[in-house]
Swiss-Prot record:
This is tRNA-specific 2-thiouridylase MnmA. Residues 140-142, 292-293 are annotated as: Interaction with tRNA. Catalyzes the 2-thiolation of uridine at the wobble position (U34) of tRNA, leading to the formation of s(2)U34. Belongs to the MnmA/TRMU family. Disulfide bonds join 99-190. It comes from Hydrogenobaculum sp. (strain Y04AAS1). ATP binds at residues 6-13, 32, 124. CDD domains: MnmA_TRMU-like.
Amino acid sequence: MIIAVGMSGGVDSSVAAYLLKEQGHDVIGVTLRFYKEECKENARVCCSPKDVQDARIVCDMLGIPHITLDWENLFKERVIDYFIKSYKTGLTPNPCAICNKDVKTAFLGFYLKQTADIDFLATGHYVIKEEGKIKRAKEKDQSYFMALVPKQSLDYLMFPVGYMTKQEIRDIAKKINLPVANKIESQDVCFLKGMDLEDYLSQFIDMTQGDIVHIATQKTLGKHKGIHRYTIGQRHGLGVSYHKPLYVVEKDIEKNILYVGEKEYLLKDAITLKDYNKLEDFEKDNMYIQIRYNSKPIPIKHIEENKDNVIIFLKEPATQVAKGQVGAIYFGDILLGGGIIS
C-alpha cells in the first residue's frame, strides 16, 4: 500500500514512518509548513522550519521520499483566523481540534487521496482505530482532538503508534539512531511560537479595561485588564479581593463586563453542543463527555437531539464549561463524536 505519513519532525511520527516501512509499505513523508520564521528558543510547538528540516533528515535516514507543503495561507484562514475571531466573540477555542479537521489530518488525507493517490494517511497521534472506530489510547490519549474529524475521513486514516507508550517509541527511535529520539514534545499552540497567549491576542484584540462584577450581588469588585484575557473557570490573576475564592463565570463582550462568583455559579447540569460531528450512534448508558483535553470525563444522564444542537444532560454538575471548547462524547473508550460547546 501507498501510505503517506504526516511528519511533524517529532519522534512519534518518525517512528510511525519507520514501522510502516518495516511492514513493507511504500511510505511517503509529508510535512506541512505553516510559517517561515523560527520560534522562540525552547518553544514546544510543531510545524516550524526546524521541524521541517528534522522531518526531512529522518526521511533521508529511512530511505523514503519527503515532500513539504506550504500551507501557511490555508492554516491562517482555517485555524488562526478562527482562533482570533473566537476570542473576539468571548469564546475559548480549541485550535488543535479545528486543525485536525480542516488542515493537517482529515483535510490533508483528503488532499493526498486526490493528488497523490495514497491508500492511507498515517499520523503519530496516540489514538487507536479498531473496526473503523476511534478509541482511547492506553497512554497519552489524543482521541479528544479527533472529535471533529468527519466519519468518512476515518476510512483513510491510520495511527500506527496508538497502541504504544512514549517510552516504547523513544526506545525504537534510539535503537535505529533517529536524531529526534529525545526531542521534546510539542505542547504549546503552534502559531503562538512560544509567545504568551495574552501578548499574542493583544496584537489583534483591543484589551480595554472594564468592570469585574459579582454575578449574584451585582457589586463591582474591580477592573479587568481586557475581557479576552480571561476564560471561564479561571481563578487566579483576577486582581480582586474577596472573602471567598472567586472564579470567572461569565463574560459580557458587548458591555465589557467580567462576571465572577463562587464555585457554585460555575456548575452546569447540561451542556449544549453545536455543529455536532457524529461518528457513532449514541448508546443508552455508559456514555461520558469530555470538555477539555486531559479533563476528567463526566457521566451522561441522557442526550436530546434537535435540528441545530445536541443537548447533554449530566449525572453530576460540571465546572469550567467554556463556550468554544470541544465537547467529545464517549461510550466507554469509543469516541462517538463531538461538537462545539455553545
